Amino acid sequence: MTTPAPKTVGIIGAAIAGPTFALHLLTHPVLRTRFHPILFDQSPPPAPVPTASSASSRSNGTGSGPGLESSPPTTSHHQRAGASVGLFPNGLHPLFSLGLSDALKKQGHECDDLALWFGEITEGCKLSHLKTARNGFWSHDFQLGAMYFERAGLQALLVDRVLQLGGEVKWSKKAVHFEAVSSSGGKQTRVNFADGTHIEVDLLVGADGGYSQVRRHLLNLRNPKTAEERWLPDFMGTTGIYGISSADKMPSTHTPERPFTESQCIFLKEGFLATGPCPGRMFRWDLILPESTSPDPSSATLESEPAVAPTPSSPPATKQEQEPWLAAITPGQYPTSTTAEILRRHLRLKHPFTGDFETMLTSSDRIIHTPLRQRVWKEDEIQWTSDSSIVLLGDAARLMLPTSGQGTGFAIEDATVLASMLLKHCSTAEAEAGAEDGFSSALEEYARLRRPRSEKMATMASWIGIVGLGNTWYYKLLRYGSAKLTPGVDLKTKKNPDPWPMDGRFNVEESSK
């Protein structure tokens, strides 16, 4: 019997979940004969390295149609996305299985100690040290601590590997409309792009972030009356300001009290500042604060999150000279003036490595301000198999608070479990036996496996977030007690198993936990 032609898998979103899923399809000996993945992302192509050869490669392109050119590997670098991501063993394991362990260890930064403090934003107030967890992120099973990456750096690693394996990545491809179409090969989805082009795919994968347009389409298929209400994640009474700063841009006269390699969490009267090391002597910082109301969603462009953050706006020259960090604030759902006012209130907050928050801001090259939302969508809201085959991955399927620490790890898990389900239900043997393409069984089991784990993690993230904010005396007491009771013993000396959810080990051949 003739081997069936590979099914086209259209993946909307080329950040983390999308490229990871594509890598599973491209590397597995069975899946690569059954599926042909194509990544689409609305972001522009990565900035080219300024060489004549790279310019020539980019201008020639490698696509098969107008506006469908793929970016050549090894000749480009991804712009800094302005945020970092952390990976624990459950997120690292699938990537290690894909043969990326050496690259991840080279490009990531392994975290060791975590110091907990209490601080105030008034001038002259010193930090109070609560506890230091020695090698607080250590995994005895992996013999490795948590790894932190700049988000764009991890994306570049994955996308470049996709291209090296002959995969396709289409930049500047904003998906604007989806419709089911019939074909001789079965049910398909036509994806229409803003540039006027379109493509038919056998499986549509939404890996396009918390404000996923693929999810919006899927929810409209389920119930147009409730689609918009179900589409927007729930506001959690919290706002977050994130940045990436450079340790090398600090004043030469400054002597840090604590080492660069140490992660810090400073509890405020309400909220907290968390910082941690990243590759290239960069460090991330997250300022998490309570907020009573979120920005009006209709006043901002709530579309799928771009893989590359927008370019910061430039303030007037006089303001920029007085407060150079203003130029690093990227346009978003909040007015720049609102973000700036919050940051000004925290300038005098002390920090063990930078000295104070103002020094941290001054060395920032990108600052992002966003309301913090969370929702775990139902099983039938993350997959559709009626007149077409659609499935969601990562933040498109479940958006969690940053206090989960697992947004990226769970996205990688999603990609791995979905690939495993395709292998289980879409085998060549089933196709030859006259069965349908197997998408229905694969997508339904994927959703059934993922939702309980997502719900548990979201509940934990919400609880940690509430306690971390310390909005009431009760939560302040819980926060203080939890910090003081944090084990100070070096975890490298303990042979404890990884706790949930870090103990998850997902493989394409099977899924677990």
Protein language model regions, located:
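Intrinsically disordered, low-complexity domain-flanking/linker segments in eukaryotic proteins
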Residues: 47-75, 182-186, 225, 297-328, ...
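Conserved mid-domain beta->alpha element of the FAD-binding
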Residues: 11-24, 205-206, 241, 347, ...
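Conserved FAD-binding catalytic core of PHBH/FMO-like flavoproteins
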Residues: 156-365
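C-terminal helical "tail/cap" subdomain of flavin- and related membrane-associated enzymes
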Residues: 2-10, 106, 127, 405, ...
